[in-house]
Amino acid sequence: MAGLGPSDFKVYEDGVPQQLKFFSVDPFPISAAIVVDTDLPAGTMKKVNETLPALVGAFTEFDEVALYRYGHTVQQISGFTGATGLSTASLNRIKRTGREGGPPVAGGPFGGPSINGHSVNDPNAGGQGDVPTAPKESYVLNDAILLAARDLGRRDKTRRRIIFVISDGREQGSNAGYDEVKRILLANDISIYAVGVDTAAIPIYDQANRIRVPGFGTGNILPRYVSDTAGDMMAEFDRQGIEQAYAKITDTARNQYTIGYTTQATKSSAFRSVDVRVLRPNLKVYAKEGYYPLPPSTQK
């Protein structure tokens, strides 16, 4: 909503009212780490590949971007560079064909020919008591966001720092846990923006994906990251919708009310809650619920 001024806002840190020292409605240049899930199903991956030029086009000449991809591992494709100077070669390096079908089937009626319950192609078929299991899949979303956040934390503080994730949101096999990643994000004032694709774009499947099944990882955790960092997420299924989401999300990230206050210096790294209120009726506020102070030696 446009037209709000400093007097329309009240900010509380740990319940204590704060005096605003900074207020702006001007658009901010963006530092964006673009994180792409390249282990999506082949059909979805094809759509994402085709939309990558539109993603780059959603940024301005004042923005900078870095590219990352992940599946069972994380890889930085390019470091931070001006968005308009991002090379075609870098975009091509992020493209993948995606996975075909579902996870491998190692047993049951669809597991191929067997003798006494053992695959005829199994060199250990003569063994006793072995239980066929499917190879464990991994989708290291937490690790990907953590790597991007650490790199992004070193960028200029005067820029708006965001991680732009394109994924179905599944998490399995990361070394980093959710709470660890969240702490790094909040300590470095980084917001997560996301385009949910594939099952994350289908409401009934998306709801099921948010349930954790022991041994199978977590489904769509992107909404948690988005909510905890005051970002935004759009779920799109077709190519045109994905491309439109890119433009809407970057516009949202760039154009926000920016308010600031001077907090009390302390050596403590404990979480500090922040409550932002707008003194007008029927408005919903999107703001981070708090932050973790950086150690004095790392603050710039």
Question: What are the language-model segments listed below?
Answer:
Residues 1-300:
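Scaffold/interface architecture of coatomer-like assemblies
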